[in-house]
A protein has these predicted regions:
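Helix-loop-beta hinge of the Bergerat
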Residues: 17-49, 117-126
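Short beta-strand element(s) in the Bergerat
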Residues: 22, 87-91, 163
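Conserved short strand/loop->alpha-helix "switch" segment adjacent to the catalytic nucleotide/phosphoryl-transfer site
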Residues: 36-60, 133-138
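Conserved ATP-binding N-box helix of the HATPase_c
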Residues: 49-79
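Short beta-strand/loop element within the Bergerat-fold HATPase_c
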Residues: 77-87
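Glycine-rich/acidic phosphate-handling loop/turn and adjacent ATP-lid/helix
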Residues: 90-140
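Conserved glycine-/histidine-rich ATP-lid loop and adjacent helix of the Bergerat-fold HATPase_c
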Residues: 145-161
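Short C-terminal beta-strand
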Residues: 163-174
Length: 184
């Protein structure tokens, strides 16, 4: 059985080191999340943009901060620190909310979900398609976090208050992901 990736909780984790990172602050305007994401991802080298997958992952982190953390209150800010190279993407996204207090519960849910999948127990897996809390709306489902723990292979960590998330993605510098254009 493979090891299930988990979200950590540790304000002192090295991924929360903001040294040398680009900083940007945004109002919690849900309609502009994609625009805010593009402002961040434009700092990344073309080699790691992966046909907009990086932008999509950044967008989900900002969207969660605006929607779940700040409850779409435009008076509240989302703060983003970012660092990019051809070998990595490192982000910290912080909101002014109460924090995602269900991280441990989400980890248990995700572990059970992965266990069902690995054991081909698809009938039981039906119970683990979508993670929901009492605050969840019709279109919430925890899918952004499921994708995040897979995409951000260098770690996904919340601070102790659980209102900031730090993520890290490693890129193979020899293999340049993205679209290859040939002249033939």
């Amino acid at each position: 059985m493979s090891h299930t990736k988990e979200i950590l909780i540790d304000s002192k984790h090295p991924l929360f080191d903001k040294s040398g990172m680009f900083y940007k602050e945004f109002p919690s305007d849900y309609r502009q999340v994609r625009f805010f994401s593009m402002l961040i991802v434009q700092k990344a080298p073309a080699e790691i943009k992966e046909i907009n997958l990086l932008e999509q992952q950044i967008s989900e982190l900002i969207k969660n901060a605006v929607r779940h953390g700040n409850k779409k209150d435009p008076a509240k800010k989302v703060r983003v620190w970012a660092s990019f190279s051809t070998g990595h993407a490192h982000l910290i996204v912080e909101d002014e909310g109460e924090g995602f207090q269900q991280v441990e519960e989400w980890n248990k849910f995700n572990n059970k979900r992965n266990e069902c999948f690995e054991n081909h127990n698809f009938e039981e897996l039906e119970n683990y398609f979508s993670y929901r809390t009492p605050e969840s709306t019709e279109d919430d489902g925890g899918n952004a976090l499921f994708a995040a723990v897979e995409y951000w292979d260098g770690g996904v960590v919340f601070n102790d208050k659980k209102n900031a998330i730090a993520v890290y993605k490693n890129f193979n510098e020899k293999k340049r992901p993205g679209i290859e254009i040939s002249s033939s």
